[in-house]
């Protein structure tokens, strides 16, 4: 089955290239970005301003192809793509939880940028701690992996070849 998804807008961020960009929003919690919704979707923003955090789903538009096994940024051995947050995914969908700063008309201002400028925005969901926070979590191969912020940036391992 094939299907298509229509973007609801796009992201404006300071990052133009995959190399050296943050790999998670928490790495650059103070970095600022904008989610610009197309005007026909702006009414859907009603009441979103009551949330401190939102989940952005977007297309990893500068990534081509995919790999079912990758050496992720936080390890030096291969793992299955679905056990990582690496960008070389079959459907190239990115997800970030960001801090909502304010909404003006059809523009959401947020902090915690880990996506590329121009990324097509696919969906927005409110982060709701009652639903989204979990206890008794297992972290798989990531258990105990804590890297200093300067190491939490991408390199060239997922560049298009």
Per-segment meaning from a language model:
Residues 1-95, 102-161:
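Cys-His-centered catalytic/binding microenvironment captured across papain-like cysteine peptidases
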């Amino acid at each position: 089955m094939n299907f298509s998804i229509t973007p609801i807008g796009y992201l404006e961020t300071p990052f133009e290239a995959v190399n050296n960009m943050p790999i998670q929003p928490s790495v650059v919690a103070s970095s600022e970005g904008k989610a610009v919704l197309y005007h026909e979707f702006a009414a859907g923003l009603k009441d979103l301003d009551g949330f401190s955090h939102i989940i952005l789903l977007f297309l990893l538009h500068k990534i081509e192809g995919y790999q079912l096994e990758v050496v992720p940024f936080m390890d030096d051995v291969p793992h299955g793509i679905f056990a990582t947050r690496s960008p070389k995914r079959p459907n190239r969908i990115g997800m970030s939880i960001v801090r909502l700063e304010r909404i003006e008309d059809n523009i959401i201002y947020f902090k915690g940028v880990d996506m590329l400028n121009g990324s097509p925005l696919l969906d927005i969901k409110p982060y709701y701690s009652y639903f989204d926070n979990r206890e008794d979590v297992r972290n798989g191969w990531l258990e105990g992996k804590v890297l200093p912020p300067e190491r939490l940036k991408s390199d060239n391992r997922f560049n298009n070849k």
